[in-house]
Amino acid sequence: MSIVNEELPIATGHARSKTRDEDNVKLEPVRGTVLVVEDDPTSREILVEMLTGWGYEPMPVGSAEEAEFAVRNKRMDAAIVDVFLPGRSGTNLITRLRERFPQAVLIGVSAMSDPAMARKCKGLGADLFMGKPLMPENLASALQSKHTSWH
């Protein structure tokens, strides 16, 4: 189980802003779908709030098994995966997601942020590894810079 040791500011705003033009409601396009795989409900909700505020469509789940079920029939543009999960590991999930979604941005995260874990995640297919607590500006930058076709 991963525990966030620091509060992360929650972004303000909405992923989809509404503007009224007489009786028509116009929704701005979503930047992309981001799978959030985090077993800690509080950490997961913070990530969902941040991603929503930045204009992404989060797909939150609590385990590797739930993640695979969630993307079975859906497109995914990026994933933020806690590498230490109950049941099947996040590192195993990263490998499977990379096979299925070769163009997706995969970010491994862990409270154990040592260089060996970063190398392991990258070796299994992650584009990036980030230690917890996550810095919102670093996460936003990683999502924006790693994949240009979906923003």
Region annotations inferred by a language model:
Residues 1-35, 137-151:
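Non-catalytic signal-transmission and effector/linker regions of two-component phosphorelay proteins
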Residues 38:
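Conserved acidic carboxylate
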Residues 41-59:
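Two-component/phosphorelay signaling modules centered on CheY-like receiver
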Residues 60-78:
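Acidic, metal-coordinating helix/loop segments flanking the phosphotransfer/catalytic sites
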Residues 63, 89-92:
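Acidic catalytic/metal-coordinating carboxylates
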Residues 69, 91-103:
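Short amphipathic alpha-helix used as the core "switch/output" element in two-component signaling
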Residues 92, 113-130, 141:
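Alpha4 helix (beta4-alpha4-beta5 surface) of REC/receiver domains from two-component response regulators
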